[in-house]
Amino acid sequence: MKRILVPVLAGVMAAGLAASGAHAEDKKTIALVTNAAADFWTIAGRGLEKAQKEHPEYNIQLIVTGEATAAGQRRELDDLLVRGVAGISISVDDAPHATEELDKVAAKAVLITTDSDAPQSKRVAYIGTDNVAAGRQAGEEIKKALPNGGKIALFVGTLDADNAKERVQGIKESLAGTKVELVDTYTDQVDFTKAKSNMENVLVKYPDIALMSGLWSYETPLIYDAVKAAGKAGTVKIVGFDEDQRTLRGISDGTIQSTIVQQPYEFGYLSAINIIKTLNGDKSWVPADGKLIVATQVIDKSNVAEFAAKLKALLGK
């Protein structure tokens, strides 16, 4: 299993604990476990860095697994429990089949979900996007791109993840009663080669496809590549999710119409800060419905330059 343990203490580049040194082992550890390797989680890591600076008494880690499966996440969680971590925030890959494992974690550590929820588990709260609402936003962007309707295809890593199911739901709700036709939703298990193949196949099978939409961060750049390679840039519209650099470039050059961006920086920061509050006996931050919603934003040609500049400053690129 490919596994990357990313330190989130600014200036530390070696893999390992976020806070190294003679007394690192005396500090409680907090970890954010991702569901894939993507720029999205690099941004979340910057939020963890802020929390680390504010709370040097903790070790705060970003754990990126290259095996983006429920089984891979279970192994990560088991390893963290063996290491005795105090708190975990996780983007859940397969909520229906993860509940038992998550409840085991919740019995031993503070558990928060972020990005993709597991509402049936004993997690303290979910921190992230209202994904149904984000799906509706994407649906509105699709309608803008296709005022006369047309065929569309959706692409996502897996429909086992709550955020994927909810985004599809929101898109369908927004498009109900229009002339936009969803031909299918394609999954790739976060296998970039399979994702690319899915997109290429759609372009061949549906020569009249009007729009393609990637629901996870890595898919929109792959759609961008596939459409350009097929010579259909500008003909096949693209609406995506998240702020991958290639997605933003595609918006700038007019190949991509828009993208729905979340606030992964806040996902990281709020996860760490609120785990620490909970460890200290403070749960006043938990909303009544157990969901701390972070707003989304539409990025298109009108605001992409400003957004890209802010993102560059955040990432130090």
Show the residue positions of the predicted features.
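Bacterial N-terminal signal peptides that target proteins for export
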Residues: M1-V8
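A residue-level marker of the well-folded mature domains of exported/periplasmic proteins
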Residues: R3, M13, A22-K317
